[in-house]
Amino acid sequence: MVDFLAENNLCGQAILRIVSRGNAIIAELLRLSDFIPAVFRLRDKTDQQKYGDIICDFSYFKGPEYYEGKLEAKPELQDLDEEFRENNIEILTRFYLAFESVHKYVVDLIRCLDDLNEGVYIQQTLETVLLNEDGKQLLCEALYLYGVMLLVIDQKMEGEVRERMLVSYYRYSAARSSADSNLDDICKLLRSTGYSSHPGAKRPTNYPESYFQRVPISSTFISMVIGRLRSDDIYNQVSAYPLPEHRSTALATQAAMLYVCLYFTPSILHTQQAKMREIVDKYFPDNWVISIYMGITVNLVEAWEPYKAAKIALNYTLDTANIREQAGRYAASVETLRPQVQQLLKEGFLREEIILDNIPKLLNCLRDCNVAIRWLMLHTAESAYDPNNKRLRQIKDQVINDSKYNPKILFQLLLDTAQFEFILKEMFKQMLAEKQLKWESYKKEGSERMMELAEVFSGVKPLTRVEKNENLQAWFREISKQIESLNYEDSTAAGRKTVQLIQALVEVQEFHQLESNLQVCQFLADTRKFLHQMIRTINIKEEVLITMQIVGDLSYAWQIIDSFTAIMQESIRANPSMVTKLRATLLKLASALDLPLLRINQVNSPDLLSVSQFYSGELVAYVRKVLQIIPESMFTSLAKIIKLQIHDIMEVPTRLDKDKLKDYSQLSARYEVAKLTHAISVFTEGILMMKTTLVGIIQVDPKQLLEDGIRKELVKRVAYALHKGLIFNPKAKPSELMPKLKEMAATMDGFYRSFEYIQDYVSIYGLKIWQEEVSRIINYNVEQECNSFLRTKIQDWQSVHQSTHIPIPKYPSVDESATFIGRLCREILRITDPKVTCYIDQLNTWYDLRTHQEVTNNRLFSEIQDTLGTFGLNGLDRLLCFMIVKELQNFLTVLQKSILKDKAVVDVFKALLTAVNPVKGIVANASKVYTNAAAKTQKIWSPYLESIMKVGQMQILRQQIANELNYSCKFDSKHLAAALDNLNKSLLSDIEAHYQDPSLPYPKEDNTLLYEITAYLEAAGIHNPLNKIYITTKRLPYFPIVNFLFLIAQLPKLQYNKSQGMACRKPADALDWAPLVLGLLTLLKQFHSRYTEQFLALIGQFIRSIMEQCTSQKIPDMPSDVVGALMFLEDYVRYTKLPRKVAEAHVPSFIFDEFRTVL
């Protein structure tokens, strides 16, 4: 029969491809289980209220029209549904493809079995495939992997969540319209089983057998697979475990497969007592906790509870006396094995000759250690026992008591065994590599010695008192030739012949009385020694390494090892050099990757890389988790050092009197600092002892691990400090903002100083790490805060700032803001609210409208710079941009949906438009026309004013931020500021030149230069927020007249004050001039410039018309509304940096020159 796995064996390749895909699917399911969007769980009330109507389970399919009708009835629900779709369709598609691949897997398996039965593969039937060793393994694995997939899905993804995800995918994707879609079949297969993985949850009836039977598989195939698993040793593992008491460990992989496959024929579990007794006697006579795939553990006591036959059969294993016997046996094993392994690990004990002479003994020791560790780890694992099940609790307590279980001792044995195994493997690999070279060198030495002896007996070579003896001369020559003729390739014959040669050399010494000559004896002894070494060397076989690999399997602990994390960390904290032993344990755990990767590799599947990366990544993440104790301990010591340096140790002045030297020495405090610093160095040394290690396919560099760990700890502590330090009480009088910022700045300075201090002791670039991580924390939090303004949110797994190795923690929100940056921004907006404060532009200061006390000034932004740095100010600026966009969008909605839809108001606009035409002219009876129009529209201006003021307020804050950024940039990095300024000016002149002459170059759309330079310019404060276009707009009817009318409706509330400019007449009106001007300016900037021109023309006409009326009626004072309008024009020109003639085009220049003198 052709090799079953050969590339030209179509049947073998077909089954191998299915099995390979099965392993890849399980890896994908495990990977995805960490990315289930929390919203699909509908755990908290807010999610239920918000998304309850758009996330449905399979009840949706009973009446889709009803659900869709509910959505269509409410536009806001439709909007939320669309937003939800945009945010989740990508991840839903990924989940759906995984679910689809599970269904496709079982369909392909059934098709392959049908092809076998129908004779598609020549000379191959189900029976012949099961007779072949590889074929038997693959068919058993194919069924087993399908069962594992179903169990993994149910364990990691709750039924309700699956249903909701499938329904959402169905609604949002085009799958329903596609004719070849098998969505119906997938839904049938993966509908909720009612199973819950939470402890204490009740098990559904007929679970999991009814779940396994949703897609019918040939019963003949199932019974034949179970037959093979029951009777054969399909992986030939027993040869690696010769002792009968190790039999169940040898067959553990097969036992796990049998456990899963039995669910496909539950009748065996229920009624066939003889078969179940046979299965338990063979596979579970001394164990009842098994690992079914990559450390997923199952307790048979619980799993087989509903099945009569299985339960009865297992009772013999669970007999109290049997449990006591097994637990006692392993307790005794641990006691004898610990000193044995520690003895073997002593420096210099494991030498080459000892290994070669004691291979069987060493392998037996390894076997005993691994079997004991396996049994104890599985049978004492917390995850294997449901704390709510009384019987399981009793069994667990009995195991722990009878085995004298001590997790620290077991962990120590695991470490020692892993280290012993690692050393033995490495030495054996080296011996295997050098085997032929050494053998040839021993052969050469032995042959040469025989030739030399031959020459001694020839009488030619002088040797004290050796007579010439031609017989011995010829005999030694012959022996030399015999040694020379030994052939390395034919090891069996060479071994036999070598033994004969050794015997001959012993005999020649006795018969020819050669003992009297010491030198001859020495030559003979040396040759015998070389021949012995040749026998030892030829016995170095690769089979030993294979046995060690089988025996050392630790895949069962893939998940339970986590329960030992605290012990590992405690050991490392006490003795950082422990990390070297830990390395061996992790390499031992990495061998678990062979299980899922073997078949994927055999078929050369492209999935190899992604599956390897997933499992290797999981393991590396665990390594990081364990070793995180080192950075944690470092930071604890650091905190103490900083405390001592700030509070206890006095700073030594540059000049110091000799007699005061003693006062400044502070020996005990300095000794404490030195001790703590030394502890930090020891921790660093500990992790760097680990050496670069290949874990799966990921290279783990200890220096990088240390740096990442330090970054992670720094991020954790800084993020927590920012979260806790920037929580404000809005009712506090005065505001807590400045004190909290000062406090936060001191905390951040403490972190910074400690980092500066530590960098040389742990060999890292402190400043670089500090800046990178703090900027990442702030940018991530800004991104999260901005998500609330975005329709398509940036998820954690999409964020460029978030990282799996160095995650930025997410904290639950304490108010409407999602993060500390949002709280800071909203607190600033609250205390500078134009309704309660008045902003004086020349002083850059806000005053309280009622008390006239200073609220805050531009020092606030210097304080934020000190606390959060440039990143913080820049992040705040970005957040304000989003808020302005939102406010402008809300404003346009109000304008379009309320104001322009109100017929009475639109009629007022029309009438006013008619009255003011032509704009260059003067309005007759102006006072009455304007007052009437303002009075008729009074009710619409309240939301309008609020939006304009908010935008203006945020623009003032953006200006202040830009000033602070620009100031600090020029101060801290003047070259960067100058370079950016020059580049900006040259780019602008190039663009202007292009508009003058289109043949000149201009950055194309695909050129990112302008976008990149903008980010730099904004970070350096080289920009004007007032010129920014925040939103795209369409043409709006009556827009200039609406804004003009809005402005003149506000003017009566204001009056000119020489000391502070335009101010509120009554504090109750709550109106601030600067935000009003800047808000209107920003709003007009979003539209075509002709709107601004028309708006300014209307103001000019208003001033001229009222002035004309006053002069004709001989009123001597200039009306306050005219003063307000003139002030508006003056400020408008000043803020926009436009030439004054823009205003003078609408108002005669003499009025501008003179109006202040008459006030």
UniProtKB/Swiss-Prot annotation:
It is found in: Early endosome. InterPro entries: WASH_strumpellin. Keywords: Endosome, Protein transport, Transport. Pfam families: Strumpellin. The keyword Transport applies. Disulfide bonds: none annotated. GO terms for biological process: actin filament polymerization; axonogenesis; cardiac muscle tissue development; endosome fission; endosome organization; heart contraction; neuron development; protein transport. Disruption phenotype: Morpholino knockdown of the protein induces cardiac contractile dysfunction and loss of motoneuron formation. Its main location: other. One of its GO terms (cellular component) is WASH complex. Component of the WASH complex. Belongs to the strumpellin family. Acts at least in part as component of the WASH complex which seems to regulate washc1 nucleation-promoting factor (NPF) activity and is required for its membrane targeting during endosomal sorting. PANTHER family: WASH COMPLEX SUBUNIT 5. This is WASH complex subunit 5. It comes from Danio rerio. The lineage of its organism: Eukaryota, Metazoa, Chordata, Craniata, Vertebrata.
